[in-house]
């Protein structure tokens, strides 16, 4: 049996239970204390919030009062000034407007902070008081509920204690009865054993005596056994009874124990959480959230109100405008700034002569004085113009200084954890930088220089004004027909144009023609002032009836040409826009809808004479064309209107010049943009029109061009017929590369796209269609197809007629070496083409020449494996044939001459002949013989053939030169024959390479350069080929073709001697 010492005694069990209960009771007490402490913290927090917002309300109120005092202090000064009377009409200067808005913002902030203080006191603080009262009341009720739950829990624990003691008592009685029962059983066993032993020890003496003894002993044993059995039975019954009671008590104890554990778990896990959440915190956080959101709403609305005021101030700062302020100032003090009445002649003592006397003997003196004034004025104007340019440059420097963007102080408001870093950031402001002193010194020095130049300019202008007035009066008095003033020169020019019945005056047509050819991309055209000396020279030439801008010369300053055009319109005696329609036109500007504005402007302008409308239509079409290049020339319609507004439409006297000029500029801008909708079309109003794509044809037909012979006239008529035929039959082309148009006129397409070509618009462009849209197509990005020989070119009309009138050329034969599969006798083909070029008669008139590109003679003579040949080189004014001629070799021949042949064959006259049906067949036949009949030849024989053919061609060319009575044309053979003997050896290759991939050596001598007349006339010199690479994969052109520019064909470059070769119009290729 197990020793009883190993089991806990009742006292130990009771002591442990009591200790556990005491711990629970102490924990419950601490829970109440913790909740009490939490309630006190909430009350204290709410009290602190009330005190905080009460103090903040006081601060906001004080801040509001201070802001109001600040605003009233300065508003009182503003009310006392005269500017206040204009405030109702909003007729205040922009800085004053900023100042007024700043004061209004201060007053607005004052009102907002007063409102904020009132919200703190009457809204937010009462909310916190209410939350505090509700929290305390709810906590008391929550504490009562918690105390009741704790009492119930302690009651359960006491019940468990009672059940446990009952279980211990019954279990002890059961154990005691069990021990007694076991003791009775032991006695019974002991008694039975004792009886057996006594019977064994006794020996019987006589039968009678033995029987008596046995009877007595049996009687004694029976009585003792019965007693033991009765005692055993009693103890057995007692044990059974006590055992049953112990089992029942244990069951009750286990049930009570489980219930107690469940109650404890429920209290700690559920009841406490419910008491805190649903009793103590009931509505506390929600009420606090509402109160704080009220604070946030007030602050955010305050911030929004402040931002609205700051936005108004920012808008006023953006509208700071010196011009508008000047206009308002003059309007406010109109009596002060209006010009005084003119001084009238006051006769003395009855002298009524109020005009200059130009009779003898003072006439000669007046003439001499006028000449002196004229000379003096020319000098002064030039000097004053230079001073003006210097002054404007200095003014721009000052504006750059004062407009530097150094106002961003966002770095000073970066978040920082320490106040020291904030202070260091704030200390490094703009005003504390060391460079501010130097900057201020530079600014003051620049300002001093500017005012010096301004004073000098104004003094010079005053002197010019006085001398000009005297000169004009003398000029008027003397009655001379010619004046040096630009305005009178333009009037005389206008009279001559009207007398000659010309719709567009010469000066207008010539200047626009020159600018449209050479100056569409000139930056600042019409804005930058030109040279006064050159302006006077051009003006004098027009006065004499000459056209100084005729031909293809480009040695004039573009700004000077633009200045001449502006001065012409400025000096018209009868301006294009008469003053009697000034108010009607200005009224149209007030319309917001651009289309309606154009309609009304059209109605006003239709009352003008037809000659004036024709000139307007021509001029504004040109200005619209010019504005389309604004990305390069920086002259959009608005900038052009600023430059042309004062010249075309002057503000009548009695009107404010500043305010009216802005409306004039807007009017001119509208006419430039909507010129097609404003002016009548050619059907409604007959007369010349400005043509963008083919304007040179109009120039060629001008009466100011050179005389056109009857032969040329016949050719022109026939050329027009052929051109129309070409336009009626579109040509199909395939795109070689992807192209993205840079303007609305240029078409975009993908590689392999099918294109329809109508006609050649220029050297680099076709007019065609793609996906139903008409526009310009770059020639270098397409492959033109034809049904006859796969290649077609649209040449100029003149060249086609010349080809028809010439007999077919002799077929060219060539011999090739076995080692040169793609090479022919280059010299034969070259000389044959030179003969064609020499036989072309020159014309004295200005013609429009279109260049054929890579599908001319050069491409027909080269291998089809290199499609880029002849498509990417520019002919020079001094070709060097010796660098491209083949040199004999023992086992190989050079084909570098193909590049030279291709370049020369691209001359407009030569390639146009090759495009005609007769010559095309001849070229095809010659090509088949020279390139397909490959017979092995000795290199020495080839060299001898070249020399013999060259000598023969030289004799023929010299004979033609002697017979020709036209102007000498530079002889290509004579110019290139001598370099032929000393030309460097060019490494041959098996096939020609595209000029796009050809590397060029540096010229030993600089090539003749043409003046920068136009992008289409730029030429580069032929250079020796350094190395000819193998045929590379076809790539897009190195540079995009430039927009359409129409070059001339009869001009020579300045500075080129008579031996230079004719300029080619080829510009499609870049090396």
Swiss-Prot record:
Record site: Arginine finger: 527
Gene3D superfamilies recorded: Arfaptin homology (AH) domain/BAR domain (1.20.1270.60), Rho GTPase activation protein (1.10.555.10), SH3 Domains (2.30.30.40)
Residues found modified as Phosphoserine: 206, 427, 500, 691, 695, 724, 795, 916, 930, 990, 994, 1013, 1027
InterPro entries: AH/BAR_dom_sf, F_BAR, FCH_dom, Rho_GTPase_activation_prot, RhoGAP_dom, SH3-like_dom_sf, SH3_domain, SLIT-ROBO_RhoGAP
Modified residues (Symmetric dimethylarginine): 927
Domain of life: Eukaryota
Listed name of the protein: SLIT-ROBO Rho GTPase-activating protein 2
Natural source organism: Rattus norvegicus (Rat)
Lineage, highest ranks first: Eukaryota, Metazoa, Chordata, Craniata, Vertebrata
């Amino acid at each position: 049996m197990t020793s009883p010492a190993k089991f806990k005694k009742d006292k130990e069990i009771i002591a442990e239970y009591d200790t556990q209960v005491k711990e629970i009771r102490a924990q419950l007490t601490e829970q109440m204390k913790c909740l009490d402490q939490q309630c006190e913290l909430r009350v204290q927090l709410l009290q602190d919030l009330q005190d905080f917002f009460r103090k903040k309300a006081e601060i906001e109120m004080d801040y509001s009062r201070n802001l109001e005092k600040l605003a009233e202090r300065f508003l009182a000064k503003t009310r006392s000034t005269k500017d206040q009377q204009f405030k109702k009409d909003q007729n205040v200067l922009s800085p004053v407007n900023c100042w007024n808005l700043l004061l209004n913002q201060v007053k607005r902030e004052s009102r907002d902070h007063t409102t904020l203080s009132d919200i703190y006191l009457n809204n937010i603080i009462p909310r916190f008081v209410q939350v505090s009262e509700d929290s305390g009341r709810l906590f008391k009720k929550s504490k009562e509920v918690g105390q009741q739950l704790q009492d119930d829990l302690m009651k359960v624990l006491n019940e468990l204690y009672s059940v446990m003691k009952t279980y211990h008592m019954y279990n002890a009685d059961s154990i005691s009865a069990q021990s007694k029962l076991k003791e009775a059983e032991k006695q019974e066993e002991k008694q039975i054993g004792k009886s057996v032993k006594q019977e064994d020890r006794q020996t019987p003496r006589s039968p009678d005596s033995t029987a008596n003894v046995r009877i007595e002993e049996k009687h004694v044993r029976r009585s003792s056994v019965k007693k033991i059995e009765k005692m055993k039975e009693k103890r057995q019954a007692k044990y059974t009874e006590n055992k049953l009671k112990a089992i029942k008590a244990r069951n009750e104890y286990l049930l009570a124990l489980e219930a107690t554990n469940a109650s404890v778990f429920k209290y700690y896990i559920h009841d406490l959480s419910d008491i805190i959440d649903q009793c103590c915190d009931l509505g506390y956080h929600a009420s606090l959230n509402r109160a704080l959101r009220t604070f946030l709403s007030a602050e955010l609305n305050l911030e929004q109100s402040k931002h609205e005021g700051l936005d108004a101030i920012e808008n006023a700062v953006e509208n700071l405008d010196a011009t508008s302020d000047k206009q308002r100032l003059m309007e406010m003090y109109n009596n002060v700034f209006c010009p005084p009445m003119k001084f009238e002649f006051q006769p003395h003592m009855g002298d009524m002569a109020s005009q200059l006397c130009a009779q003898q003997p003072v006439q000669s003196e007046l003439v001499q004085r006028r000449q002196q004034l004229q000379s003096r004025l020319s000098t002064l104007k030039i000097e004053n113009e230079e001073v003006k340019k210097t002054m404007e440059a200095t003014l721009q420097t000052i504006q750059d200084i004062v407009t530097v963007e150094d106002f961003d102080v966002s770095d000073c408001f970066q978040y920082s954890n320490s106040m020291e870093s904030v202070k260091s950031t704030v200390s490094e402001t703009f005003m504390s930088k060391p460079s501010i002193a130097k900057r201020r010194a530079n600014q003051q020095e620049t300002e001093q220089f500017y005012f010096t130049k301004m004073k000098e300019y104004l003094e010079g202008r005053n002197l010019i004004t006085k001398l000009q007035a005297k000169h004009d009066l003398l000029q008027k008095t003397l009655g001379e027909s010619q004046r040096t003033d630009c305005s009178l020169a333009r009037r005389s020019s206008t009279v001559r144009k009207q007398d000659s019945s010309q719709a567009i005056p010469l000066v207008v047509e010539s200047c626009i023609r020159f600018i449209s050819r050479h100056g569409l991309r000139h930056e600042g055209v019409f804005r930058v002032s030109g040279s006064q000396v050159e302006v006077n020279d051009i003006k004098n030439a027009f006065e004499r009836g000459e056209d100084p801008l005729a031909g293809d010369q480009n040695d004039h300053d573009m700004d000077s040409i633009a200045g001449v055009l502006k001065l012409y319109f400025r000096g018209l005696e009868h301006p294009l826009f008469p003053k009697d329609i000034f108010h009607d036109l200005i009224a149209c500007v007030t319309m917001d809808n651009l289309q309606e504005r154009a309609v009304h402007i059209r109605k006003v302008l239709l009352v003008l004479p037809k000659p004036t409308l024709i000139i307007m239509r021509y001029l504004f079409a040109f200005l619209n064309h010019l504005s389309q290049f604004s990305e390069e020339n920086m002259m959009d319609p608005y900038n052009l209107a600023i430059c042309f507004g004062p010249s075309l439409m002057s503000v009548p006297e009695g009107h404010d010049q500043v305010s009216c000029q802005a409306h004039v500029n807007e009017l001119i801008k509208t006419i430039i943009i909507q010129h097609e909708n404003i002016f009548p079309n050619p059907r409604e109003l007959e007369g010349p029109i400005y043509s963008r794509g083919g304007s040179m044809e109009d120039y060629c037909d001008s009466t100011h061009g050179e005389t056109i012979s009857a032969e040329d006239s016949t050719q022109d008529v026939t050329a027009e017929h052929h051109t129309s035929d070409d336009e009626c039959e579109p040509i199909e082309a395939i795109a070689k590369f992807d192209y993205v148009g840079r303007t609305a006129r240029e078409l975009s397409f993908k590689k392999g796209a099918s294109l329809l070509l109508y006609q050649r618009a220029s050297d680099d462009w076709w007019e065609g269609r793609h996906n139903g849209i008409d526009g310009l197509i770059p020639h270098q990005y397409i492959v033109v197809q034809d049904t006859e020989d796969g290649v077609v070119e649209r040449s100029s009309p003149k060249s086609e007629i010349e080809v028809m009138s010439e007999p077919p050329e002799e077929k060219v034969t060539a011999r090739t070496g076995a080692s040169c599969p793609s090479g022919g006798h280059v010299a034969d083909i070259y000389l044959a083409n030179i003969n064609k070029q020499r036989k072309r008669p020159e014309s004295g008139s200005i013609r429009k020449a279109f260049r054929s590109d890579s599908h001319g003679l050069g491409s027909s003579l080269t291998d089809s494996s290199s499609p880029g040949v002849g498509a990417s080189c520019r002919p020079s004014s001094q070709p060097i044939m010796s660098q491209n001629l083949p040199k004999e070799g023992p086992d190989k021949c050079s084909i570098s001459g193909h590049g030279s042949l291709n370049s020369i064959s691209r001359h407009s006259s030569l390639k146009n002949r090759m495009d005609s049906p007769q010559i095309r067949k001849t070229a095809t036949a010659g090509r088949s013989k020279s390139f397909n009949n490959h017979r092995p030849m000795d290199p020495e024989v080839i060299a001898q053939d070249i020399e013999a053919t060259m000598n023969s061609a030289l004799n023929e060319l010299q004979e033609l030169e002697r017979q020709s009575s036209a102007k000498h044309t530079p002889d290509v053979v004579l110019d290139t024959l001598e370099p032929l003997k000393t030309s460097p050896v060019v490494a041959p290759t098996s096939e020609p390479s595209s000029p796009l991939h050809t590397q060029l050596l540096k010229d030993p001598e600089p090539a003749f350069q043409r003046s920068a007349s136009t992008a289409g006339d730029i030429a580069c010199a032929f250079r020796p080929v350094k190395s000819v690479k193998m045929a590379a994969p076809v790539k897009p052109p190195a540079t995009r073709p430039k927009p359409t520019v129409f070059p001339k064909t009869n001009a020579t470059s300045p500075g080129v001697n008579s031996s230079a070769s004719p300029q080619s119009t080829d510009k499609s290729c870049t090396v």
